[in-house]
UniProtKB/Swiss-Prot annotation:
Inhibited by Al(3+). One of its GO terms (biological process) is defense response. Its main location: membrane. It is found in: Membrane. It is a multi-pass membrane protein. This is Two pore calcium channel protein 1. Residues 335-370, 376-411 form the EF-hand domain. Homodimer. Functions as a voltage-gated inward-rectifying Ca(2+) channel (VDCC) across the plasma membrane that mediates sucrose-induced Ca(2+) influx in autotrophically grown leaf cells. Acts as the major ROS-responsive Ca(2+) channel and is the possible target of Al-dependent inhibition. Plays a regulatory role in defense responses. The gene is TPC1. It comes from Triticum aestivum. Each of the two internal repeats contains five hydrophobic transmembrane segments (S1, S2, S3, S5, S6) and one positively charged transmembrane segment (S4). S4 segments probably represent the voltage-sensor and are characterized by a series of positively charged amino acids.
Length: 742
């Protein structure tokens, strides 16, 4: 660090009661001897020696925490990083506020019924509204005001560590400020007047996309392929126009033409719906009744449109998608490389361009605080150094240093925080040692699996007796209550043996923790107050949670060789798919807000036009756009393409204008033809890529030669240490190489 930072660090160290600067500094080649130990990365970056700072930066880089490059090169780097970590520690608040913003869309009173409060509260059945409560105008303003204040803090907090110049260079920050201003104005207008239109529901979703990095990357990627998508859409439109004209001319004087293809516009609409196969074969039944060979026209149309053109569109779009997505990954990798280069420069104080053995060993020693590296001797550290020194000249260059960090991220887990019980002597007694060893053993796992199997049998029997209204049901409910205590004991033993930090690091344990406490508290209240709490006295909801607990049996599949790859691939794919599913959710939110503002309130009991629609005939009245929850469910039905033309044609009749078709057609083009097809293609390629990685691991295990290790390491050299990143980099290896070469 530069000398300009010394007074600042000394002042803050005195305030926090830290050791003097003499204990913080490390002499060259000392490898951390005599320096103060920091368990937190923020303290290490602000007050640590150069090895401690470098180790904290390496850990940040491998965790995917992106620090602006200008902040890395700032002379007041230590102070900036202390503010940066304060901002990161408040991430739970920023995330909770984003959730609150989206939740507000579901709890807001629909704009179309604000003039008459009775419509929303006392006549829910008349308008087929949902069961969620609505905020009053005052409650909405208070809620929006609180979320706005937190949003302002979230947006402007980066000023503390970036500074005004760096902050204002970011296009994302500028856009956030503009949207924040528009949102504040919208709230003010809403406070003093009742307008039928608001921008706030849309801006909330945009903030969600811009704040979550994965969603932002997906949105930028999709924006980059708009040009390609419009080109293939133009080709599809030409095909549809020509096929519709051919159908209109061919069936002009037939019953098909007189009933279904009565005009070119109607023919175009029907052929578009047939392109989605939603009205097949209803649309050409009349033509099929006269000469059967007329069916050839529609068969050829479906084959060309659905099985050729649609797949061609998917292939072109997915190829462009991979190129755009590779560009985003290159940017993420660039941030990681910049952080690692900063760590390299901190150690290479003499600007030699390489690190020697002593420096690498000192860094590995400091990394023990963040990664569960082997607690071994200096000789073992030298073996790690020798493995990474590919040139054999006892010098590690910046490129080899990146391989070092990548290997650490892949091979070693995060070091969990020590248990709070470590300070008590009894925790280190022989009896506690045997108990902890038993909890960590496979025998303990087998016992829990056996209890789960008993639980499954008990749930099945209790459910069967409930259906038969048998009095023996109460006995099995008591059995389930007893099993609940066993799960609580299991959770307590694991936390005691591992420590809560190590216990919470595993996703399976998080699932068990939440589920166990929810079921246990619910069962306890049900047995303690069977009549005072009507909601809890109904055991149905607890039974569903008990069935959820049986999902832990999927752990057994991981022990079977033939199933392990498939189960592991499933969980990896679920993690990698979350950003894309999040984008689909955001699109649904946008279209739901639009649907509420243009279709809200037109579906109600007693509407004479409604009774003439297929919406009424099919008993789809609950699937409407009268409030946000109902609109989201309706859009989900449209997303799965289940009779989606029913809503399109019904709202065409209800509004009396064909302009309403734009809403449904655009939703199909964006959500289904683009997003869902991309997700399907992504899942297919990701599955094959993950299977290749699994086979590669098996080969390396069976043939642990240096060549096999080198091949495996080179396959993951770009990754950030997580399975999702490894998978993405393997999938897009060709595109990434092309982006870097260009």
């Amino acid at each position: 660090m530069s000398e300009a930072e010394a007074p600042l660090i000394t002042e803050e160290a005195a305030e926090r009661g830290l050791a003097s600067s003499g204990s913080r500094r490390l002499s060259d080649g000392a490898g951390g001897q005599g320096s103060r130990k920091y368990r937190r990365r923020s303290d290490a970056l602000a007050y640590g020696d150069r090895y401690q700072k470098a180790a904290a930066l390496v850990d940040l880089a491998e965790d995917g925490v992106g620090i602006p490059e200008d902040v890395l090169n700032d002379t007041r780097f230590g102070r900036a990083m202390s503010f940066y970590f304060v901002y990161l520690r408040l991430d739970w608040l920023w995330s909770l506020n984003l959730f609150a913003l989206i939740l507000l869309n579901f709890l807001e009173k629909p704009l179309w019924c604000r003039k008459d409060a009775l419509q929303a509260y006392d006549q829910r059945d008349l308008y087929f509204l949902g069961q969620l409560p609505y905020f009053s105008k005052t409650e909405s303003l208070i809620y929006e005001g609180l979320t706005l204040v937190i949003l302002v803090m979230d947006i402007f907090c980066p000023l503390s560590y970036e500074g005004l110049n760096i902050f204002w260079r970011s296009t994302t920050n500028k856009l956030k400020i503009v949207l924040l201003f528009i949102l504040a104005c919208d709230i003010l207008v809403f406070a003093f007047s009742s307008q039928p239109f608001r921008l706030a529901p849309y801006i909330r979703v945009v903030f969600l996309i811009m704040t979550i990095r994965e969603l932002r990357m997906c949105a930028i990627t999709l924006a980059g392929l708009i040009g390609t998508y419009l080109n293939v859409l133009a080709l599809s439109l030409l095909f549809l126009l020509f096929a519709s004209w051919l159908a209109y001319v061919t069936f002009e004087d037939t019953p098909q033409g007189k009933t279904i293809f009565s005009s070119y516009g109607v023919t175009l609409y029907q052929m578009f719906v047939l392109f989605t196969t939603s009205n097949n074969p209803d649309v050409w039944v009349h033509a099929y009744k006269i000469p059967r060979w007329y069916s050839l026209f529609f068969i050829v149309y479906v084959l060309l449109g659905v099985y050729f053109l649609t797949n061609l569109i998917l292939a072109v779009i997915y190829d462009s998608f991979k190129e755009q997505f590779a560009k985003q990954l290159v940017q993420v990798d660039s941030i990681r490389k910049n952080i690692l280069q900063k760590a390299f420069d901190l150690i290479d104080t003499n600007n030699r361009g390489y690190l020697d053995r002593e420096q690498c060993i000192s860094l590995l020693n400091e990394l023990n605080k963040y990664r569960s590296l082997p607690k071994t001797s200096r000789e073992d550290f030298e073996l790690i150094f020798a493995e990474l020194d590919r040139s054999g000249d006892f010098k590690v260059t910046s490129e080899e240093f990146a391989d070092l960090c990548n290997t650490i991220a892949i091979k070693f887990q995060k070091e969990p925080p020590p248990s709070y019980l470590e300070k008590f002597p009894f925790y280190h007694s022989p009896l506690c040692g045997r108990l902890k060893s038993f909890v960590r053993s496979r025998m303990f796992e087998y016992i829990i699996v056996f209890v789960l199997l008993i639980n499954l049998v008990a749930v099945i029997i209790e459910t069967t007796l409930d259906i038969e209204n048998s009095s023996s049901q109460e006995t099995w409910q008591e059995v389930e209550f007893f099993l609940g205590w066993i799960y609580v004991a299991e959770m307590a033993l694991k936390i005691f043996s591992l420590g809560f930090g190590a216990y919470w690091m595993e996703g399976q344990n998080k699932f068990d923790f939440v589920l166990t406490w929810t079921i246990f508290i619910g069962e306890t209240l049900t047995f303690a107050f069977p009549s005072k709490l009507p909601f809890l006295s109904n055991g149905e909801w607890i039974r569903y949670l008990l069935l959820g607990r049986v999902l832990r049996l999927t752990r057994i599949l991981l022990q079977v060789q033939r199933f392990r790859a498939f189960v592991a691939t499933f969980f990896t794919l679920m993690s990698s798919l979350m950003p894309y599913l999040g984008i689909v959710f955001c699109v649904l939110c946008m279209y739901c807000s639009i649907g509420l503002q243009i279709f809200g309130g037109i579906v109600y009991a007693g509407n004479p036009t409604l009774e003439e629609t297929d919406l009424f005939n099919n008993d789809y009245l609950l699937f409407n756009f009268n409030d946000y929850p109902s609109g989201m469910v309706t859009l989900f039905n449209l997303l799965v393409m289940g009779n989606w033309q029913v809503w399109m044609e019904s709202y065409w009749q209800l509004t009396g204008t064909s302009w309403s078709l734009i809403y449904f057609v655009s939703f199909y083009l964006i959500s289904i033809l683009l997003l869902l097809n991309l997700i399907v293609a992504f899942v297919l390629e990701a599955f094959f890529a993950e299977m290749e990685l699994e086979k590669g691991e098996e080969v390396d295990i069976q043939n642990p030669t240096s060549g096999g290790i080198k091949k495996r390491r080179s396959m993951r050299v770009r990754s950030k240490g997580t399975m999702v990143d490894i998978l993405l980099h393997h999938m897009l290896s060709n595109e990434l190489d092309g982006s870097q070469n260009s």
